Amino acid sequence: MNNTLKYWKEAATLIVAARTSHGHFPYIQPQVQFPNQQNNTSDYEVLLLKRSQKSGFMPNAFVFPGGNIESSDFSSDWIKVFSRYEQKPNFGLGLVKQLDNRSPMFTADSSKFGSLIPGEVATRICAIRETFEESGILLVVPENFNSEDNQHLVEVTDQDKEKLSKWREEVQRNPSQFIQMCKEMRCMPNIWALKEWSNWLTPVISQGVKSRRFDTAFFICCLNAKPAVSDDNKEVTSFKWWTPTEALEDYKSHKIWIPPPQFYELSRLCHFAPINELHKFIVNRSLEGCERWMPVIAQCEDGIVHTLPGDDLYPEDPDLTGEKQTVVCSNETIENLIQKGGRFHRLVLIDGKPTLLVNIKPKYKHINPLTIESESKNKL
Protein backbone atom coordinates (compact mmCIF):
# COMPACT_ATOMS: atom_id res chain seq x y z
CA MET A 1 0.00 0.00 0.00
CA ASN A 2 1.35 3.40 -0.99
CA ASN A 3 1.51 5.34 2.26
CA THR A 4 3.06 8.38 0.57
CA LEU A 5 -0.23 9.54 -0.91
CA LYS A 6 -0.98 13.15 -0.01
CA TYR A 7 -3.90 14.28 -2.11
CA TRP A 8 -6.22 11.29 -2.16
CA LYS A 9 -6.77 7.79 -0.88
CA GLU A 10 -6.79 4.66 -3.00
CA ALA A 11 -9.99 2.64 -3.22
CA ALA A 12 -11.63 -0.17 -5.15
CA THR A 13 -15.23 -0.84 -6.10
CA LEU A 14 -17.07 -3.72 -7.73
CA ILE A 15 -19.87 -3.71 -10.28
CA VAL A 16 -21.81 -6.88 -9.46
CA ALA A 17 -24.01 -7.98 -12.37
CA ALA A 18 -26.19 -11.04 -11.71
CA ARG A 19 -28.39 -13.06 -14.01
CA THR A 20 -32.09 -12.79 -13.24
CA SER A 21 -33.48 -15.24 -15.81
CA HIS A 22 -32.28 -18.05 -18.05
CA GLY A 23 -34.74 -16.99 -20.70
CA HIS A 24 -35.63 -13.69 -22.36
CA PHE A 25 -37.92 -11.04 -21.01
CA PRO A 26 -40.57 -9.57 -23.28
CA TYR A 27 -39.64 -6.14 -24.53
CA ILE A 28 -40.94 -3.29 -22.39
CA GLN A 29 -40.67 0.21 -23.76
CA PRO A 30 -38.44 2.12 -21.29
CA GLN A 31 -39.19 5.70 -20.30
CA VAL A 32 -35.56 6.60 -20.96
CA GLN A 33 -34.57 5.95 -24.57
CA PHE A 34 -31.23 4.45 -25.50
CA PRO A 35 -31.08 4.68 -29.30
CA ASN A 36 -28.84 1.66 -29.91
CA GLN A 37 -30.20 -0.63 -27.22
CA GLN A 38 -31.47 -4.01 -28.32
CA ASN A 39 -35.21 -4.62 -28.30
CA ASN A 40 -35.28 -6.61 -25.09
CA THR A 41 -34.68 -5.83 -21.48
CA SER A 42 -31.63 -7.03 -19.62
CA ASP A 43 -31.58 -10.55 -18.25
CA TYR A 44 -29.37 -9.29 -15.42
CA GLU A 45 -29.42 -6.68 -12.69
CA VAL A 46 -26.70 -4.64 -11.02
CA LEU A 47 -26.35 -4.20 -7.26
CA LEU A 48 -26.41 -0.65 -5.90
CA LEU A 49 -26.04 0.26 -2.24
CA LYS A 50 -27.35 3.43 -0.59
CA ARG A 51 -24.76 5.22 1.48
CA SER A 52 -25.70 6.45 4.92
CA GLN A 53 -26.90 10.02 5.37
CA LYS A 54 -24.08 10.39 7.90
CA SER A 55 -21.44 9.31 5.42
CA GLY A 56 -18.58 11.76 5.00
CA PHE A 57 -18.41 11.06 1.26
CA MET A 58 -21.43 11.14 -1.05
CA PRO A 59 -24.15 10.70 1.61
CA ASN A 60 -27.43 9.17 0.38
CA ALA A 61 -25.88 8.22 -2.96
CA PHE A 62 -26.51 4.87 -4.62
CA VAL A 63 -23.13 3.38 -5.45
CA PHE A 64 -21.47 0.08 -6.24
CA PRO A 65 -20.01 -1.74 -3.22
CA GLY A 66 -16.44 -0.73 -2.41
CA GLY A 67 -14.18 1.25 -0.13
CA ASN A 68 -10.67 2.23 0.90
CA ILE A 69 -7.72 -0.01 0.23
CA GLU A 70 -6.30 -1.11 3.58
CA SER A 71 -2.74 -2.08 4.44
CA SER A 72 -4.00 -5.61 5.11
CA ASP A 73 -4.97 -5.93 1.44
CA PHE A 74 -1.24 -5.72 0.68
CA SER A 75 -0.23 -7.94 3.60
CA SER A 76 2.36 -10.56 2.71
CA ASP A 77 0.27 -13.00 4.76
CA TRP A 78 -1.80 -13.39 1.59
CA ILE A 79 1.12 -15.33 0.08
CA LYS A 80 0.10 -18.41 2.05
CA VAL A 81 -3.53 -18.06 0.94
CA PHE A 82 -2.50 -17.78 -2.73
CA SER A 83 0.43 -20.20 -2.49
CA ARG A 84 -0.60 -22.02 -5.68
CA TYR A 85 -0.30 -18.80 -7.68
CA GLU A 86 2.64 -17.06 -6.03
CA GLN A 87 4.99 -17.75 -8.95
CA LYS A 88 2.54 -16.77 -11.70
CA PRO A 89 2.40 -13.21 -13.10
CA ASN A 90 0.04 -11.24 -10.87
CA PHE A 91 -1.04 -14.50 -9.22
CA GLY A 92 -2.47 -15.82 -12.48
CA LEU A 93 -4.27 -12.63 -13.48
CA GLY A 94 -1.90 -12.07 -16.39
CA LEU A 95 -0.15 -8.89 -17.46
CA VAL A 96 -2.06 -5.83 -18.64
CA LYS A 97 -0.91 -4.55 -22.02
CA GLN A 98 -0.96 -0.79 -21.49
CA LEU A 99 0.93 0.83 -18.64
CA ASP A 100 1.42 4.47 -19.70
CA ASN A 101 -1.80 5.97 -18.35
CA ARG A 102 -2.59 3.55 -15.55
CA SER A 103 -2.91 4.58 -11.93
CA PRO A 104 0.11 4.01 -9.66
CA MET A 105 -2.09 1.72 -7.57
CA PHE A 106 -1.59 -0.79 -10.40
CA THR A 107 1.87 0.09 -11.67
CA ALA A 108 3.80 0.97 -8.49
CA ASP A 109 6.33 -1.57 -7.27
CA SER A 110 4.66 -2.70 -4.05
CA SER A 111 7.92 -4.21 -2.81
CA LYS A 112 9.16 -0.66 -2.24
CA PHE A 113 6.44 -0.38 0.40
CA GLY A 114 7.35 -3.70 1.96
CA SER A 115 4.70 -5.83 0.28
CA LEU A 116 4.94 -8.98 -1.84
CA ILE A 117 1.39 -8.52 -3.12
CA PRO A 118 1.05 -6.87 -6.57
CA GLY A 119 -1.30 -3.92 -6.86
CA GLU A 120 -3.44 -5.86 -9.36
CA VAL A 121 -4.09 -8.43 -6.64
CA ALA A 122 -4.44 -6.11 -3.63
CA THR A 123 -7.02 -3.88 -5.32
CA ARG A 124 -9.14 -6.92 -6.14
CA ILE A 125 -8.82 -8.23 -2.58
CA CYS A 126 -10.05 -4.84 -1.40
CA ALA A 127 -13.06 -4.88 -3.75
CA ILE A 128 -14.01 -8.41 -2.65
CA ARG A 129 -13.52 -7.62 1.04
CA GLU A 130 -15.55 -4.40 0.87
CA THR A 131 -18.32 -6.15 -1.06
CA PHE A 132 -18.46 -8.75 1.71
CA GLU A 133 -18.48 -6.10 4.45
CA GLU A 134 -21.16 -3.93 2.85
CA SER A 135 -23.47 -6.48 1.21
CA GLY A 136 -22.66 -9.88 2.68
CA ILE A 137 -21.75 -11.28 -0.76
CA LEU A 138 -18.61 -13.39 -0.44
CA LEU A 139 -16.73 -14.06 -3.67
CA VAL A 140 -14.30 -16.84 -2.79
CA VAL A 141 -13.16 -20.15 -4.29
CA PRO A 142 -11.66 -23.29 -2.71
CA GLU A 143 -7.91 -23.30 -2.11
CA ASN A 144 -7.47 -25.95 -4.85
CA PHE A 145 -9.29 -23.81 -7.43
CA ASN A 146 -7.89 -23.70 -10.98
CA SER A 147 -8.04 -20.12 -12.24
CA GLU A 148 -8.06 -21.33 -15.85
CA ASP A 149 -11.57 -22.68 -15.23
CA ASN A 150 -12.85 -19.20 -14.39
CA GLN A 151 -14.18 -18.26 -17.83
CA HIS A 152 -17.87 -18.78 -17.04
CA LEU A 153 -20.41 -16.81 -15.03
CA VAL A 154 -19.47 -16.92 -11.37
CA GLU A 155 -21.30 -19.20 -8.98
CA VAL A 156 -21.51 -17.85 -5.42
CA THR A 157 -20.99 -20.85 -3.16
CA ASP A 158 -23.43 -21.33 -0.30
CA GLN A 159 -21.79 -20.96 3.10
CA ASP A 160 -22.94 -21.38 6.68
CA LYS A 161 -24.95 -18.18 7.23
CA GLU A 162 -24.26 -17.93 10.95
CA LYS A 163 -20.56 -18.49 10.43
CA LEU A 164 -20.41 -15.91 7.64
CA SER A 165 -22.31 -13.37 9.73
CA LYS A 166 -19.74 -13.67 12.51
CA TRP A 167 -16.84 -13.35 10.10
CA ARG A 168 -18.47 -10.35 8.46
CA GLU A 169 -18.59 -8.56 11.80
CA GLU A 170 -14.97 -9.48 12.48
CA VAL A 171 -13.82 -8.15 9.11
CA GLN A 172 -15.82 -4.95 9.56
CA ARG A 173 -14.03 -4.35 12.85
CA ASN A 174 -10.62 -5.34 11.53
CA PRO A 175 -9.97 -5.76 7.77
CA SER A 176 -6.96 -8.01 8.47
CA GLN A 177 -9.41 -10.64 9.72
CA PHE A 178 -10.29 -11.26 6.08
CA ILE A 179 -6.96 -13.06 5.75
CA GLN A 180 -7.65 -15.20 8.80
CA MET A 181 -11.13 -16.01 7.54
CA CYS A 182 -9.77 -17.28 4.22
CA LYS A 183 -7.15 -19.38 5.99
CA GLU A 184 -9.68 -21.01 8.31
CA MET A 185 -12.22 -21.55 5.52
CA ARG A 186 -9.44 -22.81 3.22
CA CYS A 187 -10.52 -20.52 0.42
CA MET A 188 -9.16 -17.68 -1.71
CA PRO A 189 -10.74 -14.39 -2.75
CA ASN A 190 -11.86 -14.97 -6.34
CA ILE A 191 -9.63 -12.29 -7.81
CA TRP A 192 -9.82 -13.96 -11.24
CA ALA A 193 -13.56 -13.25 -11.52
CA LEU A 194 -12.96 -9.49 -11.24
CA LYS A 195 -12.17 -7.84 -14.56
CA GLU A 196 -10.74 -4.34 -14.78
CA TRP A 197 -13.39 -1.91 -16.00
CA SER A 198 -12.40 1.70 -15.29
CA ASN A 199 -10.48 4.03 -12.98
CA TRP A 200 -11.86 7.32 -11.61
CA LEU A 201 -10.11 10.02 -9.60
CA THR A 202 -12.38 12.37 -7.64
CA PRO A 203 -12.26 15.81 -9.30
CA VAL A 204 -10.95 19.00 -7.75
CA ILE A 205 -14.00 21.01 -6.67
CA SER A 206 -12.21 24.32 -6.18
CA GLN A 207 -8.71 25.52 -5.42
CA GLY A 208 -7.90 25.81 -1.75
CA VAL A 209 -10.94 23.82 -0.63
CA LYS A 210 -10.00 20.47 0.83
CA SER A 211 -12.40 17.66 0.03
CA ARG A 212 -12.20 13.91 0.26
CA ARG A 213 -10.77 12.45 -2.91
CA PHE A 214 -10.28 8.87 -4.03
CA ASP A 215 -8.38 7.15 -6.79
CA THR A 216 -10.81 4.29 -7.36
CA ALA A 217 -10.36 1.13 -9.39
CA PHE A 218 -13.64 -0.11 -10.84
CA PHE A 219 -13.90 -3.86 -11.38
CA ILE A 220 -16.80 -5.88 -12.73
CA CYS A 221 -17.91 -9.49 -12.36
CA CYS A 222 -20.86 -11.45 -13.73
CA LEU A 223 -22.75 -13.89 -11.50
CA ASN A 224 -24.95 -16.73 -12.68
CA ALA A 225 -27.66 -15.88 -10.12
CA LYS A 226 -28.46 -13.15 -7.61
CA PRO A 227 -26.99 -13.99 -4.20
CA ALA A 228 -28.53 -13.04 -0.88
CA VAL A 229 -27.73 -9.47 0.17
CA SER A 230 -28.03 -7.68 3.50
CA ASP A 231 -27.00 -4.13 4.33
CA ASP A 232 -24.62 -3.48 7.19
CA ASN A 233 -26.72 -0.73 8.85
CA LYS A 234 -23.54 1.32 9.12
CA GLU A 235 -22.11 2.68 5.91
CA VAL A 236 -24.97 1.14 3.92
CA THR A 237 -28.63 1.70 4.82
CA SER A 238 -30.36 -0.11 1.95
CA PHE A 239 -29.72 -1.84 -1.35
CA LYS A 240 -31.47 -2.64 -4.59
CA TRP A 241 -30.92 -4.69 -7.72
CA TRP A 242 -31.68 -2.71 -10.89
CA THR A 243 -31.25 -3.23 -14.59
CA PRO A 244 -28.93 -0.46 -15.83
CA THR A 245 -31.82 1.19 -17.66
CA GLU A 246 -34.11 1.12 -14.62
CA ALA A 247 -31.44 2.67 -12.39
CA LEU A 248 -30.93 5.51 -14.86
CA GLU A 249 -34.69 6.03 -15.16
CA ASP A 250 -35.00 6.39 -11.39
CA TYR A 251 -32.09 8.85 -11.35
CA LYS A 252 -33.64 10.88 -14.17
CA SER A 253 -36.94 11.11 -12.29
CA HIS A 254 -35.13 12.18 -9.08
CA LYS A 255 -36.11 9.07 -7.15
CA ILE A 256 -32.46 8.37 -6.36
CA TRP A 257 -29.09 10.06 -6.73
CA ILE A 258 -26.25 8.37 -8.60
CA PRO A 259 -22.78 10.00 -8.67
CA PRO A 260 -21.23 10.76 -12.09
CA PRO A 261 -18.88 7.72 -12.28
CA GLN A 262 -21.73 5.31 -11.54
CA PHE A 263 -23.96 7.15 -14.00
CA TYR A 264 -21.32 6.84 -16.71
CA GLU A 265 -20.65 3.15 -16.07
CA LEU A 266 -24.34 2.23 -15.92
CA SER A 267 -24.76 3.98 -19.26
CA ARG A 268 -21.99 1.79 -20.67
CA LEU A 269 -23.76 -1.33 -19.43
CA CYS A 270 -26.88 -0.36 -21.38
CA HIS A 271 -25.14 -1.72 -24.48
CA PHE A 272 -25.54 -5.23 -23.13
CA ALA A 273 -28.94 -6.87 -22.67
CA PRO A 274 -27.88 -10.53 -22.22
CA ILE A 275 -25.40 -11.06 -19.40
CA ASN A 276 -23.52 -13.55 -21.56
CA GLU A 277 -22.66 -10.74 -23.98
CA LEU A 278 -21.48 -8.55 -21.12
CA HIS A 279 -19.37 -11.37 -19.71
CA LYS A 280 -17.81 -12.10 -23.10
CA PHE A 281 -16.94 -8.42 -23.50
CA ILE A 282 -15.26 -8.06 -20.11
CA VAL A 283 -13.27 -11.28 -20.57
CA ASN A 284 -12.07 -10.30 -24.06
CA ARG A 285 -10.73 -6.94 -22.87
CA SER A 286 -9.60 -8.05 -19.42
CA LEU A 287 -5.90 -7.43 -20.12
CA GLU A 288 -6.33 -4.22 -22.12
CA GLY A 289 -6.35 -2.06 -18.99
CA CYS A 290 -7.73 1.45 -18.78
CA GLU A 291 -6.53 4.97 -18.09
CA ARG A 292 -7.27 7.01 -15.01
CA TRP A 293 -9.91 9.68 -15.52
CA MET A 294 -10.20 12.81 -13.42
CA PRO A 295 -13.16 14.98 -14.46
CA VAL A 296 -12.36 18.67 -14.84
CA ILE A 297 -15.39 20.78 -14.02
CA ALA A 298 -16.49 23.73 -16.16
CA GLN A 299 -19.03 26.11 -14.62
CA CYS A 300 -21.24 27.64 -17.33
CA GLU A 301 -24.03 30.21 -17.17
CA ASP A 302 -26.79 27.63 -17.03
CA GLY A 303 -25.18 24.49 -15.68
CA ILE A 304 -22.11 22.40 -15.03
CA VAL A 305 -20.00 20.39 -17.44
CA HIS A 306 -17.81 17.52 -16.25
CA THR A 307 -15.18 17.17 -18.98
CA LEU A 308 -13.18 13.97 -19.42
CA PRO A 309 -9.97 13.09 -21.30
CA GLY A 310 -10.40 13.46 -25.05
CA ASP A 311 -12.86 16.36 -24.82
CA ASP A 312 -11.79 19.59 -26.52
CA LEU A 313 -12.39 21.45 -23.24
CA TYR A 314 -10.20 19.09 -21.24
CA PRO A 315 -6.78 20.53 -20.27
CA GLU A 316 -3.73 19.03 -21.98
CA ASP A 317 -1.97 18.66 -18.65
CA PRO A 318 -4.55 18.69 -15.84
CA ASP A 319 -3.30 19.37 -12.33
CA LEU A 320 -4.30 16.21 -10.50
CA THR A 321 -3.26 17.62 -7.13
CA GLY A 322 -5.59 20.62 -7.20
CA GLU A 323 -2.88 22.97 -5.95
CA LYS A 324 -2.94 25.07 -9.11
CA GLN A 325 -6.03 24.17 -11.04
CA THR A 326 -9.37 25.77 -10.34
CA VAL A 327 -12.80 25.04 -11.71
CA VAL A 328 -13.05 26.44 -15.23
CA CYS A 329 -15.62 29.22 -15.46
CA SER A 330 -17.31 30.23 -18.69
CA ASN A 331 -19.69 33.08 -19.43
CA GLU A 332 -21.22 30.98 -22.19
CA THR A 333 -24.23 28.73 -22.06
CA ILE A 334 -23.85 24.99 -22.42
CA GLU A 335 -25.74 25.15 -25.72
CA ASN A 336 -23.21 27.64 -27.12
CA LEU A 337 -20.34 25.37 -26.14
CA ILE A 338 -22.00 22.42 -27.84
CA GLN A 339 -22.77 24.35 -31.03
CA LYS A 340 -19.04 24.95 -31.48
CA GLY A 341 -18.74 21.25 -32.20
CA GLY A 342 -15.53 19.28 -31.84
CA ARG A 343 -14.71 16.32 -29.66
CA PHE A 344 -17.15 15.65 -26.84
CA HIS A 345 -16.47 13.55 -23.77
CA ARG A 346 -18.53 15.25 -21.13
CA LEU A 347 -21.35 14.96 -18.63
CA VAL A 348 -23.68 17.95 -18.68
CA LEU A 349 -25.83 18.88 -15.67
CA ILE A 350 -28.66 21.38 -16.11
CA ASP A 351 -31.06 21.80 -13.17
CA GLY A 352 -29.59 18.63 -11.73
CA LYS A 353 -30.54 16.58 -14.80
CA PRO A 354 -27.70 14.68 -16.50
CA THR A 355 -26.82 14.26 -20.15
CA LEU A 356 -23.81 12.43 -21.54
CA LEU A 357 -22.28 13.80 -24.74
CA VAL A 358 -19.65 11.46 -26.15
CA ASN A 359 -18.34 11.24 -29.71
CA ILE A 360 -14.73 10.22 -29.13
CA LYS A 361 -13.35 6.79 -29.95
CA PRO A 362 -12.88 4.72 -26.77
CA LYS A 363 -9.43 3.37 -25.98
CA TYR A 364 -8.28 -0.10 -24.98
CA LYS A 365 -11.15 -1.95 -26.69
CA HIS A 366 -13.65 -0.35 -24.34
CA ILE A 367 -17.08 1.02 -25.20
CA ASN A 368 -18.67 4.45 -24.96
CA PRO A 369 -21.80 4.95 -22.86
CA LEU A 370 -25.16 5.00 -24.54
CA THR A 371 -26.32 8.59 -24.31
CA ILE A 372 -29.43 9.25 -22.28
CA GLU A 373 -32.34 11.23 -23.69
CA SER A 374 -33.32 13.51 -20.82
CA GLU A 375 -35.16 16.77 -20.34
CA SER A 376 -31.85 18.57 -19.98
CA LYS A 377 -30.80 17.39 -23.44
CA ASN A 378 -34.04 18.73 -24.87
CA LYS A 379 -32.99 22.15 -23.62
CA LEU A 380 -29.75 22.04 -25.58
From Swiss-Prot:
Nudix hydrolase domain residues: 8-264
Cofactor: Mg(2+); Mn(2+)
EC code(s) of this entry: 3.6.1.-, 3.6.1.77
Record keywords, A-Z: Hydrolase, Magnesium, Manganese, Metal-binding, Peroxisome
Motif placement: Nudix box: 115-136
InterPro entries (alphabetical): NUDIX_hydrolase-like_dom_sf, NUDIX_hydrolase_dom, NUDT19
GO annotation, cellular component aspect: mitochondrion; peroxisome
Motif (Microbody targeting signal): 378-380
Location in the cell: Peroxisome
Chain positions of site Important for coenzyme A binding: 51, 57, 212
SUPFAM superfamilies assigned to the protein according to its UniProt record, in alphabetical order: Nudix
Substrates-to-products reaction catalysed: an acyl-CoA + H2O = an acyl-4'-phosphopantetheine + adenosine 3',5'-bisphosphate + 2 H(+); CoA + H2O = (R)-4'-phosphopantetheine + adenosine 3',5'-bisphosphate + 2 H(+); hexanoyl-CoA + H2O = hexanoyl-4'-phosphopantetheine + adenosine 3',5'-bisphosphate + 2 H(+); octanoyl-CoA + H2O = S-octanoyl-4'-phosphopantetheine + adenosine 3',5'-bisphosphate + 2 H(+)
A GO molecular-function annotation: coenzyme A diphosphatase activity
PANTHER family (UniProt xref): ACYL-COENZYME A DIPHOSPHATASE NUDT19, TESTOSTERONE-REGULATED PROTEIN RP2
Record function comment: Fatty acyl-coenzyme A (CoA) diphosphatase that hydrolyzes fatty acyl-CoA to yield acyl-4'-phosphopantetheine and adenosine 3',5'-bisphosphate. Mediates the hydrolysis of a wide range of CoA esters, including choloyl-CoA and branched-chain fatty-acyl-CoA esters and at low substrate concentrations medium and long-chain fatty-acyl-CoA esters are the primary substrates. Highest activity seen with medium-chain acyl-CoA esters and higher rates of activity seen with the unsaturated acyl-CoA esters compared with the saturated esters. Exhibits decapping activity towards dpCoA-capped RNAs in vitro.
Subunit structure: Monomer.
Sequence similarity: Belongs to the Nudix hydrolase family.
Protein name according to UniProt: Acyl-coenzyme A diphosphatase NUDT19
Protein source organism: Xenopus laevis (African clawed frog)
